[in-house]
Regions:
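Hydrophobic-face positions in mid-chain alpha helices that act as interaction patches
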Residues: 1-99, 105, 110-169
Length: 169
């Protein structure tokens, strides 16, 4: 029909400057040393970006944004998406996580919650081209981090959102 596909998140992130990594996501990905970090977000050229375990620098947006022009956060870490990246309604990994939640909530007739959760993590690694060991990730014992976010016009202390580890239990 002559229509050209363009990823809608790319449009929000790169044309409107309305989509950047938030502080909670930053806490989880850095704290867990999650190998999907660079698959999810681009490094930041900001002078205030934080060095991560993958050797790149990232900067997250604090909660709330009153800037109507969306010009403050242009150099912060944005989704690692181009106009040609497929838009997924729901990925297979998310289905495994939903099934794990159903098994926890309504019982084993929905499957083994732990096995479904771990399959969700493994599938997510595969979907994002990550070759790191899922077993090592799940057994890491790491937790989300508290961190300070700064720029020339603010400083924000973000508490760790939880003490949960990547392990199921």
């Amino acid at each position: 029909a002559g229509m050209v596909f363009r990823n809608n998140i790319d449009w929000l992130a790169n044309q409107y400057n309305e989509c950047r990594m938030g502080s909670s996501m930053f806490s989880y990905l850095l704290g867990y040393q999650d190998p999907r970090l660079s698959a999810y977000f681009e490094a930041s050229p900001s002078a205030y970006a934080v060095a991560a375990f993958d050797g790149k620098n990232y900067q997250a947006v604090p909660p709330g944004n009153a800037n109507q022009q969306n010009t403050i956060y242009t150099d912060f870490s944005k989704p690692n998406i181009t106009s040609n990246t497929p838009t997924y309604w729901m990925r297979a990994s998310e289905v495994y996580f939903l099934r794990a939640e159903a098994a926890l909530r309504w019982g084993s007739e929905f499957g083994d919650a732990e096995a479904l959760y771990e399959q969700g993590v493994a599938t997510s690694f595969d979907e994002n081209g990550i070759s790191s060991s899922v077993d090592d990730y799940l057994a890491s014992g790491l937790t989300p981090i508290a961190h300070n976010m700064r720029a020339s016009y603010y400083s924000y202390n973000a508490a760790a959102p939880t003490t949960a580890t990547p392990a199921f239990s």
